[in-house]
């Protein structure tokens, strides 16, 4: 009963959101609650933390942003505010990545399996996605960040789909910084879709059996939108140690970093710890040296 009451309060906050305040809180709006900007990501374009070597930075960092709901519950906030805090943290995280010379950031925002959550929660999430992405189009343009959204977008609400198309069109010319958002994404679905595309092209006489190799296959995956489709580093927060059907093909030789910290609390220092761990590893890509 209490959990349902909590959930209904979260929904009510979303319904009142456009009237009471912007979709995402301004800095300091969570005053008297647990602060989410501890360790705010501020680093100059030319500045690299002393613990890190810039030449060893990953080109593509993927993140599974786990723990937003638990963070909200622990801090006495509504579920919707937990997602808001997580979205704010993602922008800070991506901004630091780009300043450190990391070209591509991909974030697992909503899995295909997440449709199994309570319908009200899913509706809340879709509403938040649409409001947030719409409100940040000018921000992405000002930072010259290209945004791509991947996943089975056929099921998402029409309003969100229109915003996705608008955002991708507005940022498609930017080359140096690339943020990939996976919404209704499934690694299995991605691989299955690639197989179907190859079979279809084969039937049309566009490719032969001997043409099919890893390079051709990767061009049919949804990560073909980026120059670096395979992440060098995957970070998952909240202590969970699984990939949850994310980038099943692309993660073949990726280095993993699992953090016990909930995503809204994954600050600059925690990210530096992940990068230090990554840079100390001997990447072998399956070979025995």
Curated annotation (Swiss-Prot):
PROSITE patterns cross-referenced by the UniProt entry: UPP_SYNTHASE
Main location: endoplasmic reticulum
Transmembrane segments: 2-22
InterPro entries assigned to the protein according to its UniProt record, in alphabetical order: UPP_synth-like, UPP_synth-like_CS, UPP_synth-like_sf
Keyword annotations from UniProtKB, A to Z: Endoplasmic reticulum, Membrane, Transferase, Transmembrane, Transmembrane helix
Gene3D superfamilies with a match to the protein in the record: Decaprenyl diphosphate synthase-like
EC code: 2.5.1.-
Pathway field: Protein modification; protein glycosylation
Cofactor(s) demanded: Mg(2+)
Species classification: Eukaryota, Viridiplantae, Streptophyta, Embryophyta, Tracheophyta
Record has Transferase as a keyword: yes
Protein name: Dehydrodolichyl diphosphate synthase 4
Repeat recorded as keyword: no
Matches recorded under Pfam families: Prenyltransf
Family: Belongs to the UPP synthase family.
């Amino acid at each position: 009963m209490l959990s349902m009451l909590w959930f209904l309060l979260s929904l009510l906050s979303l319904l009142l959101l456009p009237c009471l305040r912007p979709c995402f809180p301004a800095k300091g709006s969570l005053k008297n609650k647990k602060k989410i900007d501890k360790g705010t990501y501020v680093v100059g374009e030319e500045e690299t933390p002393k613990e890190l070597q810039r030449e060893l930075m990953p080109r593509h960092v993927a993140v599974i942003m786990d723990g937003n709901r638990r963070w909200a519950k622990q801090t006495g906030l509504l579920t919707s505010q937990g997602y808001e805090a997580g979205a704010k943290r993602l922008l800070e995280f991506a901004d630091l990545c780009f300043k450190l010379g990391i070209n591509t950031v991909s974030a697992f925002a909503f899995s295909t399996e997440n449709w199994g959550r309570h319908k009200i929660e899913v509706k809340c999430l879709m509403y938040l996605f649409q409001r947030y992405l719409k409100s940040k189009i000018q921000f992405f343009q000002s930072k010259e960040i290209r945004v791509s959204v991947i996943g089975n977008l056929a099921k998402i609400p029409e309003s969100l789909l229109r915003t996705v198309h608008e955002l991708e069109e507005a940022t498609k010319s930017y080359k140096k910084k690339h943020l990939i958002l996976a919404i209704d994404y499934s690694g299995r679905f991605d691989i299955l879709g690639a197989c179907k595309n190859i079979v279809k092209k084969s039937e049309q006489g566009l490719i032969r059996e001997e043409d099919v190799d890893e390079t051709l296959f990767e061009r049919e995956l949804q990560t073909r939108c980026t120059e670096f489709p395979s992440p060098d580093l995957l970070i998952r927060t909240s202590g969970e140690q699984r990939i949850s059907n994310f980038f099943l093909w692309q993660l073949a030789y990726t280095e993993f970093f699992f953090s016990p910290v909930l995503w809204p609390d994954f600050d600059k220092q925690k990210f530096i710890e992940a990068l230090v761990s990554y840079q100390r590893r001997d990447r072998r890509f399956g070979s025995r040296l």
